[in-house]
Regions:
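Polar low-complexity intrinsically disordered regions
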Residues: 14, 30-34, 63
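N-terminal acidic leader/helix
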Residues: 1-29
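Short, charged early-sequence alpha-helical segments and their helix-coil boundaries
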Residues: 43-78
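Intrinsically disordered, low-complexity regions
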Residues: 19-22, 41, 49
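DNA-recognition alpha helix
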Residues: 33-41
């Protein structure tokens, strides 16, 4: 199970990742990229890593929507 703390850390990671990075990867590569960055910040056991992998996969449409919204906002402010 993904703990609330892990969720907060993941979403902070998504917010701190450049939009171009979030949009450049295919789905499976983006999951692995985010998981690798998460593990670099905090050690997690293999079972939690699997839960987090599944959670990220389920949230990919939302992650991409957020990235696209951030991109539109950034382009609109220039």
């Amino acid at each position: 199970m993904v703990s609330p703390n892990m969720m907060r850390q993941l979403w902070a990671l998504v917010e701190s990742t450049q939009v171009s990075t979030l949009l450049q990867f295919e789905d499976s590569d983006l999951v692995q990229f985010l998981l690798k960055r998460f593990k670099a910040q905090q050690s997690i056991d293999p079972q939690d890593a699997r839960y987090l992998d599944t959670y990220i996969q389920s949230k990919l449409p939302l992650i991409r929507d957020i990235a696209e919204d951030r991109q539109a906002i950034n382009q609109g402010s220039h």
